[in-house]
């Protein structure tokens, strides 16, 4: 049954991804028909057609490679390499005015933007899931070997600003998030304004980069912290130390060895340290309903496999707790997406940040994100929200003045207006 579940999710990803590309290409197609351009082919998917038919001089085809689609427009020769080779030589057709070329090129991004707005209205109605960890800037865990700890940050501190920019949450869904501001920070030190015990303080952290192989893209800046969220036991192995101590599903651990904890990562880190040191008992303060009590758990190594590290027997922590639905307006969603796209482009082209073109994700990364979202609780709502951001990205990035993008076609058409003759195909 699990295999069918994964296959179904994969099919959802393929269909949704192709919907986004198909709508974009539909914009080009309808604009070309409106402006009277010759259309050889409107194809969904690539490769040799497994089905095709001709209606009104246009061949409609379905390829066998499920990765988008294209419109073959012989009068827009610069599109052939990207959107399919035409069967009709361009020189046998009447020329197309620069205005018509611009309209056809703009129509694709316009349809992507309209699809983003459509998704935004749906999200406004059904809501977007958000968790306690998404909506806080309080630190739940700090890696004791990381830059944040060295700079003086501790669990329970609340981050107020990064490099002078106020932050409102941890999740990198907008420019006012802790994660986003760390990733796009500039300079050798990251200035972090935080509050502890009612007092505002400053910390200066040296960014950390996760080691990568030569063939991998360079990792982005981190300070190795996690947001605060309740430590709720999701599942306990039977006959494990945790089970023998009386811990059960749904228990909330509020303190460890007398110290308040703000994240289950604190417990996991304490257990990990026992792999290279002595195994010490951990005393947890547990909240179960309205009751509060202490339980002491001594981790031990599982019998199988023999080289396993010590374990408490807690299979999983319920990280996505206190999930609620927010209903951002379409304007708020589109404005946030536009801001994030422009912010990303600014970071990519800035010589002062570590964000480069290599960090931008392609089709594989997009498919992976969709796959993970579909697997998450309320995944379909998350997918709708992400589709707003993705379509705004698709619309704006395609308007960049690069030859392989719609913006490149617009630029060439503007050059044609200035020169009063088309750009030579030998230059493209």
Q: Where in this protein do the model-derived segments appear?
A:
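PDZ/PDZ-like peptide-tail recognition elements
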Residues: 106-138, 179-180, 191-193, 200-235, ...
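Small-residue-rich helix-interface/hinge motifs
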Residues: 5-87, 397-419
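Residue-level signature of transmembrane alpha-helical entry/exit and packing/kink sites
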Residues: 5, 9-13, 96-105, 109-112, ...
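PDZ/PDZ-like domain segments forming the peptide/carboxylate-binding groove
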Residues: 123-161, 165-168, 218-255, 259-262
